[in-house]
Amino acid sequence: MSLWDSLLIPERERDQLRRDVASSRPTHAWLFTGTAGAPHREAAKVFAAALLCEQPDPQNRGCGECKGCVNVMNGSHADFTHFRTEATNISIEEARELVMKAQDRPTVGRWRVI
């Protein structure tokens, strides 16, 4: 069972994310928003895991078993930063920090995911 199977989001949205992961040139930015407990938070994490998945077949990325997936899901992947806030706005300092992280090159995976 892949990470995608557990998502509680509309099938159309899940399929779009999977297509983007399987693409050799995924969209450069996605922004996931939602209230606490919303399924979109989990979708963002699964999407990040799939982008950093070590499966060679793009159609199988998001396996949930490789080191890349496991590390993203437990929050310890070097190329994954999970940014969340309950505030309506983020501070200038937080925005600057995110921009700095986004400029870093990936260290382990193919992408830097924030």
Model-derived segments and their meaning:
Residues 1-113:
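P-loop/Walker A NTP-binding region and its immediately flanking N-terminal helices
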